[in-house]
UniProtKB/Swiss-Prot annotation:
Top-rank taxon, per record: Eukaryota
Native organism taxonomy: Eukaryota, Metamonada, Diplomonadida, Hexamitidae, Giardiinae
Entries under InterPro entries matching the protein: Anion-transp_ATPase-like_dom, ATPase_ArsA/GET3, ATPase_ArsA/GET3_euk, P-loop_NTPase
Cellular component annotations (GO), alphabetically ordered: endoplasmic reticulum
Role of this protein: ATPase required for the post-translational delivery of tail-anchored (TA) proteins to the endoplasmic reticulum. Recognizes and selectively binds the transmembrane domain of TA proteins in the cytosol. This complex then targets to the endoplasmic reticulum by membrane-bound receptors, where the tail-anchored protein is released for insertion. This process is regulated by ATP binding and hydrolysis. ATP binding drives the homodimer towards the closed dimer state, facilitating recognition of newly synthesized TA membrane proteins. ATP hydrolysis is required for insertion.
Keyword Signal: no
Organism field: Giardia intestinalis (strain ATCC 50803 / WB clone C6) (Giardia lamblia)
Gene Ontology MF terms: ATP binding; ATP hydrolysis activity; metal ion binding
GO biological process: protein insertion into ER membrane
Major subcellular location class: cytoplasm
Family matches, as HAMAP family: Asna1_Get3
Active-site residue list: 53
Residues annotated for ATP binding in this entry: 22-29, 249, 276
Protein name: ATPase ASNA1 homolog
Enzyme Commission numbers on file: 3.6.-.-
Length: 354
């Protein structure tokens, strides 16, 4: 396979491109640089870089402030970026429902619970109570990112959406959301249709009304048919691909393997891995620590090449300066499509140095 992302750049059918991996491996730099590359290579199309990481970094990468609405990247008229603010947006939705229904969850709702008499339904309503009361629930960041994605589909404004994802665990939850949302919608629909009386009684014991929960669902959750469409597109290798990002160290390699295996279970395409922070050092390098680190890195690079022999493996060198601003992002992007020639590629045995 080619040691570059050129095939992804050249395939114009991609609607969704994800960059993900362990925290601190350069996902934001890689996704931001690739979005610049795509936009400047295809100036007649519009692209969006969407951060789904609660700890957003794309504003820092571009040295430009981005928010919850798509904002044009300075100097690149066909590239937009946005950072999903899940907490504030979800609370706004909650407040809108409370205003419409004229109610709000009782802060002491949990004390009114009748214990476990309703089993799993009680747990579901407890979660909904938190949802209504303060606009938070487990997985909220991933959920709101997914809801924003649904909105983007409806506009059909961008040729490709590039995702700067959160660390692996968050990302996997996000990728599983189409199926999860579909199940949640079906559960609530069945509850509403078949258990209206019991549901109303349980919610009353918790200081809630059906209007609270179902009103909020109507405002936030997408329609089932759109969710199914997203699920199908994520699994279509002509429309969606995932680029793993890692560094040549054990923990990052382990996390990458976990990610690739899970993507296979989700039936999502992943055929490229970018390895960042690779030392350009060999046996002739005067720095003993550099030689030692290069020896360690090369061991893991060899393992990655062996594990993923049918993947595009891209090596990006450790840089003297941080990658920040358009000029530096462009410079970094070059290593994604033009293989960098490391000094050890001519003399590939830094381990010979003691």
């Amino acid at each position: 396979m080619l040691p570059s992302l050129h095939d992804i750049l050249d395939q114009h059918t991609y609607k969704w491109i994800f960059f993900g991996g362990k925290g601190g491996v350069g996902k934001t730099t890689t996704s931001s640089s690739f979005s610049v590359l795509m936009a400047e290579t295809r100036p007649n199309e519009k692209f969006l870089l969407l951060s789904t990481d609660p700890a957003h970094n794309i504003s820092d990468a571009f040295d430009q402030k981005f928010g919850k609405a798509p904002t044009q990247v300075s100097g690149i008229p066909n590239l937009y970026a946005m950072e999903v603010d899940a907490s504030n947006e979800m609370k706004s939705a909650v407040e809108a429902v409370q205003k419409e229904t004229g109610s709000a969850a009782d802060n002491d709702a949990e004390s009114k619970s009748e214990g476990d008499m309703f089993g799993g339904l009680n747990d579901l309503i407890t979660c909904a109570s938190s949802f209504i009361k303060d606009g938070t629930f487990p997985g909220m960041d991933e959920m709101w990112s997914f809801i924003n994605l649904i909105k983007l589909i409806d506009t059909n404004e961008y040729s490709t959406v590039i995702f700067d994802t959160a660390p692996t665990g968050h990302t996997l939850r996000f990728l599983e959301l189409p199926e999860t949302v579909n199940k949640v919608l079906e559960i609530f629909t069945r509850l509403k249709d078949n258990m209206g009386g019991m549901l109303s009684m349980v919610m009353q014991t918790m200081g809630l009304s059906q209007n609270d929960i179902f009103g909020l669902i109507d405002k936030t959750y997408p329609k089932i048919d759109v969710v199914k469409r997203i699920s199908a597109e994520f699994r279509d290798p002509s429309l969606c691909t995932f680029v793993g990002v890692c560094i040549p160290e054990f923990l990052s390699l382990y996390e990458t393997e976990r990610l690739v295996q899970r993507l296979a279970v989700l039936d999502m395409d992943c055929h490229a891995i970018v390895i960042n922070f690779v030392l350009d050092a060999n046996a002739a390098t005067p720095c003993s620590m550099c030689r030692s680190r290069a020896r360690m890195q090369n061991k893991y690079i060899d393992q990655i090449n062996e594990l993923y022999d049918d993947f595009n493996i891209v090596l990006s060198p450790l840089r003297h300066d941080e990658v920040r601003g358009i000029a530096n992002l462009r410079d970094y992007a070059e290593t994604l499509i033009k293989p960098y020639r490391f000094c050890w590629s001519a003399n590939p045995d830094p381990s010979s140095a003691k």
